[in-house]
Regions:
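A short, N-terminal "cap"/entry segment at the start of jelly-roll beta-barrel domains
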Residues: 1-48, 55-56, 128
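Conserved hydrophobic/aromatic beta-strand scaffold that supports enzyme active sites
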Residues: 5, 20, 36-38, 64, ...
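Ligand-binding loop in jelly-roll beta-barrel domains
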Residues: 32-34, 94-119
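Short histidine-centered beta-strand/loop micro-motifs
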Residues: 48-58, 76, 82-83
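Short, conserved beta-strand element in jelly-roll/cupin
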Residues: 57-74
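A generic structural motif
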Residues: 73-77, 99-101
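Short acidic-glycine-tyrosine-enriched beta hairpin
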Residues: 76-95
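Acidic/histidine-enriched, glycine/proline-rich intrinsically disordered or flexible terminal extensions
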Residues: 116-128
Length: 128
């Protein structure tokens, strides 16, 4: 789910502050501890080979985040693609790969246990 910042409802606007809120932006019920993550990614990075060996060869962890700069495209198990770019909020449900279309920096919030499993898997893949 991609939402441009401009499409997030303004709940309050006063001199010096604009408060935007998107409700019902995914469900974290039962996911336990959440980790805050900062990723800096170069154009061309593709997680497909790094996710080989995970269930469905995809990241099975949901993520909520914000794109500070750049552009990324996710592909799900059915082949559906979605592109997020600078100033977009996003929710990536379980079952995705990510390709970096333009140098990017993102902030994500993910279930700590599930995403640590994925990150450790990628570390092992890179080691060879």
């Amino acid at each position: 789910m991609r939402i441009a910042k401009e499409d997030v409802d303004v709940k309050m606007e006063i001199p010096g502050a604009v408060i935007r809120q998107r409700t019902d932006f995914g469900d974290a019920t039962g996911l336990g501890r959440i980790s805050g993550e900062c990723f800096t990614l170069s154009a061309g990075v593709d997680t497909t080979p790094l996710f080989q060996g995970l269930e469905g060869n995809l990241c099975q962890c949901p993520h909520w985040g914000f794109v500070l700069r750049g552009q990324l495209t996710t592909t799900d198990a059915e082949g559906t693609q979605e592109t997020v770019k600078a100033n977009d909020l996003f929710y990536w449900p379980p079952g995705h790969n990510v390709k970096v279309d333009a140098d990017a920096e993102i902030i994500m919030f993910s279930p700590q246990h599930e995403h640590s499993h994925v990150i450790n898997h990628m570390i092992e893949k890179v080691k060879g």
